[in-house]
Amino acid sequence: MSYKLLIINPGSTSTKIGVYENEKELFEETLRHTNEEIKRYETIYDQFQFRKDVILNILKEKNFDITTLSAIVGRGGMLKPVEGGTYAVNDAMIEDLKVGVQGPHASNLGGIIAKSIGDELNIPSFIVDPVVTDELDDVARLSGVPELPRKSKFHALNQKAVAKRYGKDSGKGYENLNLIVVHMGGGVSVGAHKQGKVVDVNNALDGDGPFSPERAGTVPVGDLIKMCFSGQYTESEVYTKVVGKGGFVGYLNTNDVKGVIDNMEAGDKDCEKIYKAFLYQITKTIGEMAAALNGKVDQILLTGGIAYSPTLVPDLKSNVEWIAPVTVYPGEDELLALAQGAIRVLDGEEKAKIY
């Protein structure tokens, strides 16, 4: 069957849209929003009509007939924790997206805009593998402090997309494999995928795991507590040290990993030190996830923007190939991953889940 899909991926200052015919991209646009435009709205939900109009206007400009669409797919937002998969957007989901039950985030608008356009056209609307995807084993939820359970916050959409792609490419099927998926971008998430479920993963936003271009990962917690009560920092300043100004930004004042590697190869010792620590921490976390899978690992998958690195990828491979063979799927194509999630449902390969 042939399907035409409109894909909507809202970010804080832009909305990315794509129109796909099955897995073929017909066109893609990044609609940028100025600070002035965004500032007009008090809450993220208040931006709904503005962003929807911008999307419909660009489709009109391109003379695209929206009545030819089969479904609308939005980026999944900060809902209650759910298991991975493709979800039909329903009223319960819309209510939770409006308030952002796990926090305000532009991606909350994805499902809201998708349902609004879908309902007008009388076609289904979906979200796919939202960032709150949570399939953790119960043992992985305990942190050691009862009030602070471990949370599943990771690059669920891309991790699931490459894991399913490898399942197809290998002919074995995602549900029959044990995989370790390593997403390396602005944050780094390392997930243990056990027969179709992410049973353990580091909280790549503000929890634990390797440091990344902009995030701190696991830090010495006693010292962090002292920092919080030193009187020198506000709460948001400490948070920014962990998310935004951690990792490469903290040490080298840049989030450009490629530039750091170039400098290292030109003899910069500071860059070499940070690069080696970065490589070491990712290696160690892969080892941790191999242990979570009891050493039964079929394949390690590397993905995200940093997986394009001609230096880091061979270095990482040589560190972890003793665990399992390594396959590289560089970059991240969120629009395609969202399209594929909808196609699996429209084709009857998967059932749409109900929120």
Curated annotation (Swiss-Prot):
<dbReference type="GO" id="GO:0005737">
    <property type="term" value="C:cytoplasm"/>
</dbReference>
<keyword id="KW-0067">ATP-binding</keyword>
<dbReference type="Pfam" id="PF00871">
    <property type="entry name" value="Acetate_kinase"/>
</dbReference>
<dbReference type="GO" id="GO:0006083">
    <property type="term" value="P:acetate metabolic process"/>
</dbReference>
<dbReference type="GO" id="GO:0008776">
    <property type="term" value="F:acetate kinase activity"/>
</dbReference>
<keyword id="KW-0418">Kinase</keyword>
<dbReference type="InterPro" id="IPR023865">
    <property type="entry name" value="Aliphatic_acid_kinase_CS"/>
</dbReference>
<dbReference type="InterPro" id="IPR011245">
    <property type="entry name" value="Butyrate_kin"/>
</dbReference>
<dbReference type="InterPro" id="IPR000890">
    <property type="entry name" value="Aliphatic_acid_kin_short-chain"/>
</dbReference>
<comment type="similarity">
    <text>Belongs to the acetokinase family.</text>
</comment>
<keyword id="KW-0547">Nucleotide-binding</keyword>
<keyword id="KW-0808">Transferase</keyword>
<keyword id="KW-0963">Cytoplasm</keyword>
<dbReference type="InterPro" id="IPR043129">
    <property type="entry name" value="ATPase_NBD"/>
</dbReference>
<dbReference type="GO" id="GO:0005524">
    <property type="term" value="F:ATP binding"/>
</dbReference>
<dbReference type="GO" id="GO:0047761">
    <property type="term" value="F:butyrate kinase activity"/>
</dbReference>
<protein>
    <recommendedName>
        <fullName>Probable butyrate kinase</fullName>
        <ecNumber>2.7.2.7</ecNumber>
    </recommendedName>
</protein>
